[in-house]
Amino acid sequence: MHGLKQLLIFTDGSCLGNPGPGGYGVVMKYKAHVKELSGGFALTTNNRMELLAPIMALEALKEPCQIILTSDSQYMRQGITQWIHGWKKRGWLTAAKEPVKNVDLWQRLDAATSTHKIDWRWVKGHAGHIENERCDTLAREAAEAGPSEVDTGYQAKG
């Protein structure tokens, strides 16, 4: 893994109501370069946006990288570093033999991580962490902008 570009990625998701309009925010740093990504959906959940943020960041990369990825989502971090191994062994079922929630995004995140070396970090949200606060703002603004895009993987309980 020597010679890989070293990136810092910060991610956050937001949802106005849960479910409701949602958004994701990403700050990517490589040397002196900073890139921001964000997007919104008409109806989604907070957890889906927390998963979509790192997916969008990783899918934007054009080559394998060494990454420190920081999020305030324990759900996303624990899922990708711990729970996913059991889910995959059980054919995407939980230990209780229930289908994994948000499986479409977990599978996408799993695929997006495959070519990178990633150190997953957690930071407390709303605690003054500059990049996390910026991601929070990007995600919230995307959710508040009246997004019309449909989160096709979101299934409303009906």
Swiss-Prot record:
Keywords on record: Cytoplasm, Endonuclease, Hydrolase, Magnesium, Metal-binding, Nuclease
A biological-process GO annotation: DNA replication, removal of RNA primer
Name of the top EC class for this enzyme: hydrolase
Annotated catalysed reactions: Endonucleolytic cleavage to 5'-phosphomonoester
Matching SUPFAM superfamilies: Ribonuclease H-like
Residue ranges constituting the RNase H type-1 domain according to the UniProt record: 3-144
Cofactor: Mg(2+)
Principal place of residence: cytoplasm
Cofactor note: Binds 1 Mg(2+) ion per subunit. May bind a second metal ion at a regulatory site, or after substrate binding.
Entry GO terms, CC: cytoplasm
Binding-site residues for Mg(2+) 2, renumbered to this chain: 12, 136
Cross-referenced Pfam families: RNase_H (PF00075)
Intrachain disulfide bonds: none
Residues the record lists as binding Mg(2+) 1: 12, 50, 72
Localization per record: Cytoplasm
GO molecular function: magnesium ion binding; nucleic acid binding; RNA-DNA hybrid ribonuclease activity
Enzyme Commission number(s) from the entry: 3.1.26.4
Purpose: Endonuclease that specifically degrades the RNA of RNA-DNA hybrids.
Subunit structure of this chain's protein: Monomer.
Classification via PANTHER family: RIBONUCLEASE H1
Descriptive protein name: Ribonuclease H
Biological source species: Shewanella loihica (strain ATCC BAA-1088 / PV-4)
Organism lineage string: Bacteria, Pseudomonadati, Pseudomonadota, Gammaproteobacteria, Alteromonadales
Gene name of the encoded protein: rnhA
